[in-house]
A protein has these predicted regions:
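Beta-strand-dominated extracellular/periplasmic modules and repeats
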Residues: 1-192
Length: 192
């Protein structure tokens, strides 16, 4: 038997993969999709669906979010009034069979960019999935911040159609933000 044939017949060996083998360390996060506790003032849900270029749900994706708190400060920032027990700043949710995800959070406050320019309240979103060799990065902006959105340095660089793909829509318990990977209504992604 050749070495190659032996590798395919010996139980317990990891099969070769394009980007593998799979290493799941730290995939489940401690807080999962809960950026804030349920009792946190202003707690809301950001829910959505991830769709491929044909409009089909992506059932095995991972949505990660990072954001500032309502005061515009990130978790771990110095300050006496930050409650690190109830605000984590990070959420992670696997998409279900219908491509849906949900993150419990609060609406973030505006933050300053590295060059000091005030940015509109937003949530950073990373998306990982089978078939993607690199993660996709986008942002969620809020429809009730028209003045801040009109001045946001990143949003103003985009054409009006791309800009609309980054603005969530209000829902009964928070906001809805669908992520479209390709096609006519493709979400704007950033290459950073």
């Amino acid at each position: 038997m050749t070495e190659r044939a032996e590798a395919t017949t010996v139980p317990g060996r990891t099969p070769s993969q394009t980007i593998g083998p799979f290493f799941g360390f730290a995939l489940p996060s401690e807080t999962g999709p809960l950026v804030v506790d349920a009792a946190a003032p202003g707690a809301l849900w950001v829910r959505g669906q991830v769709l491929d270029g044909a409009g089909e749900p992506v059932p095995d994706g991972l949505v990660e979010t990072w954001q500032a708190d309502p005061s515009g400060r990130y978790a771990g920032s110095r300050g006496l009034d930050q409650d690190s027990r109830s605000f984590h700043g990070f959420g992670r949710c696997a998409t279900d069979a219908a491509g849906r995800y949900a993150i419990r959070t609060v609406k973030p406050g505006p933050v300053r960019s590295l060059d000091g320019v005030l940015q509109a309240p937003h949530i950073e979103v990373l998306f990982f999935a089978r078939g993607l060799l690199k993660r996709l990065l986008t942002r969620i902006y809020f429809p009730d911040e028209p003045t801040a959105n009109a001045r946001d340095p990143l949003l103003t660089m985009l054409d009006p159609r791309a800009r609309t793909t980054l603005v969530a829509t209000p829902s009964e318990d928070g906001y809805r933000f669908d992520i479209r990977l390709q096609g006519e209504h493709e979400t704007a992604f950033f290459d950073v």
